[in-house]
Amino acid sequence: MDTKRCFANRFDDYQGSLLAGQCEEAVAPLVTATIERILQELPPLGGGAEARGATAGASACQGGLYGGVAGVAYMLYHVSQSPLFATARERYLRSAKRLIDACARAEEWGEPDADTRAAFLLGGAGVYAVATLVYHALGRSDYVQPLGKFRALCAVCAPVSFLECGSDELFVGRAGYLCAALVLKQKLAQEVLTPAQIKSICQAILDSGKQYAIKKRKPFPLMYSYYGTEYLGAAHGLSSILQMLLSYHEHLKPSDRELVWQSVDFLMEQEQNCNWPPELGETIERENELVHWCHGAPGIAYLFAKAYLVSKKPQYLDTCIRCGELTWQKGLLKKGPGICHGVAGSAYVFLLLYRLTGNSKYIYRAQRFAQFLFTEEFKAGSRVLESIYSLYEGFSGTVCFLIDLLQPNQAEFPLFSVFV
């Protein structure tokens, strides 16, 4: 096997026993140490005069949940919700509040940017969603303030073409806004958008996809582009858009629901040897293929997981399982430890498959990938990180994965649940 993008997986597969060295007593200290390292590496958030604090805070908060300190706030929130770290809960939540408050100030004081105001992973919607979660976890009644700001952004992304680059994908578009609302519904145990708001956003996604498919003469009902590229993967593409529509399928008209299922099946037909190309119409080069959450099987698996959970049709679960097999072969990625295009993102596929099947083989595989993260081979051969604290590219996402490895019955890819 060529290993240009990944390390060779030399691990034996599951033989009936989990790894004793990946128990709570071994992993919890690694989590704590990694969190402390992340907190030490954070950029200054500013202080003193308001203007100076605003400038410094804005710089630290650039990158939204994906690459900024808002993502660290989410990681700390996630850790605080685990009973395994109950003694540190209040400290982590206070740190999370300090970080997310800085990001909220940056949203308020910064230059208004129509392109990112309603963005989930790269802008305001994600910041307000995490602020809501942190405030709620602290027992503060004023969690309704960031929640109100999140709700108000619904009007921003309701127009069909509210973004020139593409209005429907996960990072900055409507799928991301719906995903954030789904996270809030799950964590707060209440719907945060009205049925009318949900229907308006879903209808805009459907209308946009229909219009694009007709304009480009596609032989299938829904298609989208981002900066002119017809992506298929979870980061910017068709799979996560369809995943969000399935997550709100009860709000769709029966005829539109049928278009979504036709599009899901169309995407399933684009599979090439257990993987999908980054964009529609590409042919995968097996020796150099992308096997990432952002582009490829490890991210597209979540659409088919959702399709299986909604429909109970075995072909969707079978597709997920094939995604897992490819990820076991080629998921020890050289791009780092993160969840977007790193080892933790690959390993989350195994935790997803464990929850879908109950097969302990997948916990074992996730344990092996976790073990590999701390080997000299990985440290020496993986790409140097621009930001160790990034939720998606750095160690904050890795911390979320390690926590979930210890509680696999609740495990889910950060901010991307199919179980709601």
UniProtKB/Swiss-Prot annotation:
GO cellular component terms attached to this protein's record: plasma membrane
InterPro entries reported for this sequence: 6hp_glycosidase-like_sf, LANC-like, LanC-like_prot_euk
Domain of life where this protein originates: Eukaryota
Alphabetical list of Pfam families matching this protein: LANC_like
One GO term (biological process): carbohydrate metabolic process
Family from the record: Belongs to the LanC-like protein family.
Name listed for the protein in its UniProt record: LanC-like protein 3
Gene: LANCL3
